[in-house]
From Swiss-Prot:
One of its GO terms (biological process) is protein transport. The gene is icmW. This is Type 4 adapter protein IcmW. One of its GO terms (cellular component) is cytoplasm. InterPro entries: IcmW. Disruption phenotype: Deletion of the gene leads to a strong decrease in intracellular growth in human monocytes. Mutant is unable to evade phagosome lysosome fusion, but retains the pore-forming activity. Mutation severely impairs the translocation into host cells of multiple effector proteins, including SidA, SidB, SidC, SidD, SidE, SidG, SidH, WipA and WipB. Loss of this gene has an effect on the levels of IcmS. Its main location: cytoplasm. Keywords: Cytoplasm, Protein transport, Transport, Virulence. Interaction with DotL is critical for the export of IcmSW-dependent substrates. NCBIfam families: IcmW_IVB (NF038222). Component of the Dot/Icm type IVB secretion system (T4BSS), which is used to inject bacterial effector proteins into eukaryotic host cells. Part of a subcomplex which recruits effector proteins and delivers them to the core transmembrane subcomplex. The IcmS/IcmW protein complex plays an important role in protein translocation by interacting with multiple Dot/Icm effector proteins to facilitate their translocation into host cells. Interaction promotes conformational changes in the effector protein, which may facilitate display of a C-terminal translocation signal. It is found in: Cytoplasm.
Amino acid sequence: MPDLSHEASAKYWFEYLDPMIYRVITFMESVENWTLDGNPELEEAMKQLGQELDDIEKIDLGLLAEEDKFIRIVGNIKSGRGLRLLQAIDTVHPGSASRVLIHAEETSLSSSDPAGFFLKRNIVFERLRLLSRVFCQYRLKLVLRALEGDE
């Protein structure tokens, strides 16, 4: 059962192979003071969802067609938890996280509806990951050496 608590999700991403993911998630979560994390009803529902995911390999997520629910859940919790949830379903059913993203793209009417907001947060996450790679210490030193004529 994936532990979908905020603490367990943070630990999961901290121990993930790519340390940049944890840094990006931590940065995003530092400004996510509007999420429903900590709400007792949500926390109980997330715990129950984690338990239900124990048997996820027996469920055909494609036939279940609950992408809207995943979009709404992920859109209202901290980024790390949302990404952990998507990663958990994708591990058991490869491509299921992509189906959720595609469903959001197909159903979004604006960036302010739940699907649009979900997509916007995913785009921010991906762009921050990209920027962290572009402006990594190694590349900045390489540019500095080139500007100083050492390269």
